[in-house]
Each structure stands twice: as structure tokens, then as C-alpha cells.
């Protein structure tokens, strides 16, 4: 065996380079407004990735495409196989804990691939994929699934009065009527439609509650009447027995 095989350079070169990380772009995230756009083309990735880990142009991502999913990066970053052995391996998919709103990630192209779940784009410039554990990737995936808090619309007294007046006229106004009212009270037609849906639900609850109260009152009156009749009969029977 040649002595050169045991030189310091060869020994160091043969050591696993597992700590080599896949660095995400430092100049900002790559996001898209639609799912149909490709993440990168054959020659435009050099500005987004380090030259050593730039993905090849023929690489297919998750489900055949590299996509921006709801302004979140979703795809695969590939490390060239000559940079390190297979001990670095593949970051496993999130499995059953992956949220249902994200397409299943099943495409792998070998041990050199690193699967990246959806990550908030604000975090992309600071992410070092190679140092993330499975649990951390799952937490990042859960961040994507959190629902945004809905803002409650606050109506003015004038708007509420106009809405209530129209509701007293009709419980189901058509689109034209809603648009006319929306222009008059400076609201969007969608807000007027939602208000009427909620108001009809409240009206039905009130109607159901009043109906139940009426039934209970009728039952109470009937029970009271029966009790009074029984009392009269008892008094009458007592008088008959005394005579």
C-alpha cells in the first residue's frame, strides 16, 4: 500500500465532514405569490446559495417541483455528495406530526438531501439547517400551521342603526341591497354580509329561546290550573262530607 495513503492530508480529507452545514441565503428569503413558480432556474441560484452547496438545475423538489407555499419556503436543499459522506444522512420527514395543510414530503434524491419544512420567511436569513434537530424542524412546521388571529370589526352607532333598520325590513337582503347599504355606511359588502349572517343566528337563538319560554309558561299555567281545580274539588268533597 503506498505510504502516501497515510499522509496527514489524506487522513484529514477522509474524516467525515458532518459539521458542514447548509447555509440559507443571507440576502433574504425566496418567496412566491403562487404555487406555480419555480424556486430557482438553471443559472440563477448562485446569488441565493453558497457556491459549494448550490443545487443543480435538474434537481426535482418535493412532489416534482420546488414551491413557495403560502409565502413559506418548501423544498429540498441538496449537498453535493463529494462534500461529505453519508453519515450526515437525510433529515427525516416529519411523518404523522406534519400538519395537514402542507403537501406530504416524500421525495428524496439520496443521502445528500436535506429536507426543509415550511419555515417563516423572516427566519430564513438566520437559519442553519445543518444544526437543526428533528424536534426543532417539527416546531418550525407547527409555526406554519398556526392560524392568524382574526380582527373583530367594530361598528359605529350609525352603522349599527342602519344595519338594524334593514334587518327589520328583510332578514335576507340581496347583493345589490347589501352593496347599497355598504356604500351608505362606508363598509365593505363582505362585512355587511357577515353582519347579517351573525344577526340572523342571534335572531334564531332569541326566537328559539322565546319559544321555549312560552312553552314553559304554558306548562306552568296548565299545571297551576290543574292544581286549582284539584283544590276546588277537595274543598267541595270536604263540604259534602260535613253535610
From Swiss-Prot:
Q: Which residues bind DNA?
A: 148-207
Give residue spans, biased composition: Polar residues: 217-226
The keyword DNA-binding belongs to this UniProt entry's keyword annotation? yes
* Origin superkingdom: Eukaryota
> What's in the keyword line of the UniProt record?
Developmental protein, DNA-binding, Homeobox, Nucleus
SUPFAM superfamilies associated with the record: Homeodomain-like
- Biased composition regions of type Basic and acidic residues, renumbered to the chain: 227-243
**CDD domains per UniProt:** homeodomain
Its GO biological process annotations read: regulation of transcription by RNA polymerase II
Its subcellular locations are: Nucleus
Instruction: Give Gene Ontology CC terms.
Output: nucleus
Q: Which is a Pfam family this sequence falls into?
A: Homeodomain
Q: In which tissues is it expressed?
A: At the start of gastrulation, it is found in a patch of cells encompassing 60 degrees of arc on the dorsal marginal zone.
An MF annotation (GO) of this entry: RNA polymerase II cis-regulatory region sequence-specific DNA binding
Do you know what upregulates this one? Answer: Induced by activin (even in the absence of protein synthesis), lithium chloride, nodal/nr-1, nodal2/nr-2 and derriere. Not affected by basic fibroblast growth factor, and repressed by retinoic acid, and by UV light.
Per the record, which residues fall in region Disordered?
201-243
Family label: Belongs to the paired homeobox family. Bicoid subfamily.
Function according to Swiss-Prot or TrEMBL: Plays a central role in executing Spemann's organizer phenomenon (the dorsal blastopore lip of the early Xenopus laevis gastrula can organize a complete secondary body axis when transplanted to another embryo).
UniProt name for this protein: Homeobox protein goosecoid isoform A
Q: Which organism is it from?
A: Xenopus laevis
Lineage runs: Eukaryota, Metazoa, Chordata, Craniata, Vertebrata
